[in-house]
A protein has these predicted regions:
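Serine-dependent protease modules
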Residues: 20-283, 287, 293-321, 329-333, ...
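Exposed loop and linker-edge segments at protein-protein interfaces
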Residues: 127, 284, 394, 402-408
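Extracellular Ig-like/FN3 beta-sandwich strand-entry sites
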Residues: 320-322, 427-429
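C-terminal structural cap/anchor segments
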Residues: 345, 352-393, 397
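Conserved catalytic motifs of ABC-family nucleotide-binding domains
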Residues: 288, 398
Length: 457
């Protein structure tokens, strides 16, 4: 009995220690909650969707956090980037309209401004931390409106602070994101509606903006590091967008290729592909070349996690900057000089042709490259309404309309002018010349023809 009593007494101090630690942790959670939750915003944008061949407006839900006393809110581009009307509910449950200031699909960041006229409450501002100082295993809180449940808080840890995703990841609007940044991975619960909300450390500082969740697995959420967000918001507040330089290079991690290319460990960036007509292609670079230096500074992307730093080394320069690249091809090294160009918009403006039953988009250079189009003339068909005139005329999503009744369509403005003129004139039959998979074909829009749904058997 004495021995059993002795063992039991030895365990008591441990119990008290655990209780004290739990109390301290709980207090830290409360502190972090109280510092950030008042700045949390429940966002209800009304977005426009053109993908079905007609303009549809729908209400969605997201989150955001106030980062400036004038009422500026940071959220995700995929939450508010396509919004025409935005309403924000603050922590005191007051709802205010907000204006879209600008966004950056490449990092999935957007900025809103609350309309504070007539609002007599207090604007609480969250403190933005330093994502470069975070640690794997660090305790964090995720705040937002999961499944539209506003003012929600979940807890977890930082699982990884430098997760990389290829730039082929696309936002719901179709734009690519992820090339220029790494992601914070957390096991704190993140669901639909959490997007745009803050990831918070236990000191009550925002270290990331929640952006992505993996719904095929539990406890896998991802946030944009707050230092990336800071850079994006500064540019958006100044210009409404983020300006980047571009040379048209897609890079690949070099680790598995070092023996073949004969490069030193941690030296060089492998060119996997080049965009046609890009500065790099015009300067004579080729897939398989290894970039060793930019303006005399060594560069390396041995691992995929190092690729964003390489892209940013170019993108962060003003467009029109002359740069010098030291390049290795085979066993030879040479210097290539070129000039950067603006990256430009990832996607063009959308437009609905309601009478024809289709939606189109202006073609940007990045769209031309992504869709392997011959050039950027014409308009890109983003949607065809089922059994509408365009559908019955044989148009498909992804077609490029080059001519309308033999008139060339250089861009969306030319198309709008032609469409409105034909509509005003009451023209019922229109001939379209379209490009599909590199081939040209004719499609006829017949406004006197109407399709009918066939009954299901």
């Amino acid at each position: 009995m004495k021995r059993l009593l002795f063992v039991s007494l030895l365990t008591i101090p441990g119990l008290f220690l655990n209780a004290a630690q739990a109390s301290t942790y709980q207090e830290q959670v409360y502190l972090a909650r109280d510092r950030v939750l008042p700045a949390l915003v429940h966002i209800q944008p009304v977005v426009e969707d053109y993908r079905t061949g007609e303009l549809k407006k729908q209400a969605v839900v997201g989150s955001g956090v106030i980062f400036h006393p004038d009422g500026y809110v940071v959220t995700n581009y995929h939450v508010a980037g396509k919004a025409k009307r935005i309403y924000c509910t603050l922590s005191d449950r007051e709802q205010l309209p907000a204006d879209y200031i600008g966004g950056d699909p490449s990092t999935d960041v957007a900025v809103l401004k609350l309309r504070l006229e007539g609002y007599h409450g207090t604007i609480h501002v969250a403190e933005l931390g330093d994502s470069d100082s975070i640690q794997v295993g660090q305790q964090v809180l995720a705040m937002g409106s999961p499944l539209a449940l506003a003012r929600s808080v979940s807890a977890g840890v930082i699982s990884t602070k430098d997760r990389y995703f290829s730039d082929e990841y696309r936002l719901p609007s179709g734009e690519k994101t992820g090339r220029f940044n790494l992601w914070i991975q957390t096991d704190a619960a993140i669901n639909f509606g959490n997007s745009g909300g803050p990831l918070v450390d236990l000191n009550g500082r925002v270290i990331g903006i929640n952006s992505r969740a993996t719904f095929m697995a539990n406890n896998l959420g991802f946030a944009i590091p707050i230092n990336v967000v800071k850079q994006a918001t500064q540019a958006i507040l100044k210009d409404g967008h983020v300006t980047r330089s571009w040379i048209g290079v897609t890079a690949q991690a070099l680790q598995e290729m070092e023996n073949y290319f004969g490069t030193d460990r941690n030296r060089g960036v492998l060119i996997a592909s080049l965009d046609p007509g890009s500065p790099a292609a015009e300067a004579g670079l080729a897939a398989g070349d290894v970039i060793l230096e930019i303006d005399g500074r060594p560069v390396s992307a041995r691992f995929v996690e190092e690729l964003p730093a390489f892209y940013n080394a170019i993108a962060s320069r003003p467009p029109g900057t002359a740069i010098s690249l030291k390049v290795q091809r085979g066993d030879q090294e040479r210097v290539v000089n070129l000039e950067t160009r603006p990256l430009g918009q990832l996607q063009g403006e959308d437009y609905e042709c309601s009478e024809w039953g289709l939606t189109v988009r202006d073609i940007t250079r990045q769209m031309q490259i992504a869709n392997q189009l011959r050039d950027s003339t014409g308009v890109f068909v983003t949607g065809v309404k089922r059994l509408g005139p365009a559908d019955l005329g044989g148009l498909n999503q992804g077609d490029v309309i080059q001519l309308v009744d033999r008139a060339p369509m250089d861009n969306l403005d030319a198309f709008k002018t032609r469409y409105e003129a034909l509509r005003s004139a009451g023209t019922k039959k229109i001939m379209l010349t379209v490009r599909r998979a590199g081939a040209t074909r004719i499609a006829i829009i017949n406004l006197e023809q109407r399709g009918e749904e066939q009954p299901h058997e």
